[in-house]
Regions:
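Glycine- (often His-adjacent) and acidic-residue-rich active-site loop
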Residues: 56-93, 109, 221-222
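Hydrophobic alpha-helical membrane-association signature
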Residues: 32-35, 83-86, 189, 230
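Terminal peptide-recognition signature
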Residues: 17, 21, 36, 54, ...
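Terminal low-complexity tails and localization/encapsulation signals of metabolic enzymes
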Residues: 1-3, 248-261
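Crotonase-fold acyl-CoA enzyme core
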Residues: 92-208, 235-240, 244-248, 254
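Conserved CoA-thioester-binding segment of acyl-CoA-metabolizing enzymes
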Residues: 1-55, 92
Length: 261
């Protein structure tokens, strides 16, 4: 399917999703969010796709937040609540997906753009990128899951600083507090990100899926409850042909040929 505001480009087992509104720094309006929701659903259902990379068009912005004109048009608290819930549900598709997603942050990742990145499994960034949640400077707060995901990823102290000041942070600062996983020079961002992707793709597909599930579910549980989930996922992995192939390949000192079953 073709879209108006996003591009979806398959590269083997990888799908690269680009928010394509460079004239407005790839701002997220309702149509763009709807297109992302459709694309995320389609990619989750596509057995040929094993990893999703998300980025923004151009070299200035990843996604510079929500569309201000749409925010201004809100007439009531219920309008705002509906908008926030809609964005939360779009981003939750990434958070709950069985496939890993990587936000490839090539420029400003602000507000809703930062929140979209936080919903991804991993985040890579250009060393020149700026990241933040500046909503309080507009008299509102993050509404697409930012207050919750940032606290879980980087801790409540970092979340309070980012949300309450509304400051923008360098990619280096975001990396230091754990928001960004890997930093690259701008000209090396795509290659470096895809190298991470292909490392993940070389691992056991079932094991990757089960590991994502164990981490996602365990975050909201006690240590003891999380370890029960972990042992469940470990048990499932141990019954797969991939596990037998991985063990055999290790003992035979060869590269494993995983089949995803």
């Amino acid at each position: 399917m073709s879209y108006e505001n996003i591009l979806v480009e398959p590269e083997g087992a990888v799908a690269i999703v680009t928010v394509n509104r460079p004239k407005v720094m790839n701002a997220l309006n309702a149509k763009t969010l709807s297109e992302l929701a459709h694309a995320f659903d389609a990619l989750e259902a596509d057995a040929n796709v094993r990893c999703i990379v998300i980025t923004g068009a151009g070299d200035k912005a990843f996604i510079a937040g929500a569309d201000i004109n749409e925010l201004k048009a809100m007439q009531s608290a219920m309008d705002a609540k509906r908008l926030a819930y809609f964005g939360q549900q779009v981003f939750a598709r990434l958070d709950r997906a069985s496939k890993p997603s990587i936000a490839m942050i090539n420029g400003f990742a602000l507000g809703g753009g930062c929140e979209l990145a936080l919903a991804c499994t991993l985040r890579t960034a250009s060393k020149t990128a700026k990241i933040g949640l500046p909503e309080v400077s507009l008299g509102i707060i993050p509404g697409y899951g930012g207050t919750q995901r940032l606290a879980r990823i980087a801790g409540p102290g970092v979340a309070r600083e980012w949300v309450l000041t509304g400051d923008l942070f360098t990619a280096e600062e975001a990396h230091r507090v754990g928001v960004v996983n890997r930093l690259f020079a701008p000209e090396e961002l795509r290659e470096g990100t895809l190298k991470i992707v292909h490392t993940i793709l070389s691992r056991g597909p079932v094991a990757v899926r089960l590991a994502i599930e164990a981490i996602r579910r365990g975050i909201n549980m006690s240590q003891q409850e999380g370890e029960i989930i972990e042992s469940d996922m470990f048990g499932l992995a141990s019954t797969t042909a991939d596990m037998r192939e991985g063990m055999a390949a290790f003992l035979e000192k060869r590269k494993a040929d995983f089949q995803g079953r």
